[in-house]
């Protein structure tokens, strides 16, 4: 299991959900509080995610991984 630290996901960071990348699209972190990250994804809207349960990958602002 990959350890992910909540501090990596600051507001404004762009991410993709590794398992749902094509379905959800690119997301932008809105907040990260108490091991919960709120992200607004382009295809499915706002999701609140526990980074210990969902693998997220940080991407650059142009959307390339």
Name each model feature, range by range.
Residues 37-42:
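SH3/SH3-like beta-barrel fold
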Residues 9-11, 32-35:
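A short, compositionally biased
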Residues 1-15, 23, 63:
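Mixed-charge, Lys/Arg-rich low-complexity intrinsically disordered regions
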Residues 24-32:
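Short beta-strand-centered aromatic/proline hotspots
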Residues 2-6, 33, 56:
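Hydrophobic transmembrane signal anchors and adjacent membrane-proximal interface regions, especially
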Residues 1, 45-65:
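Intrinsically disordered, low-complexity, charged/polar segments
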Residues 16-17, 45:
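N-terminal non-cleavable signal-anchor helices
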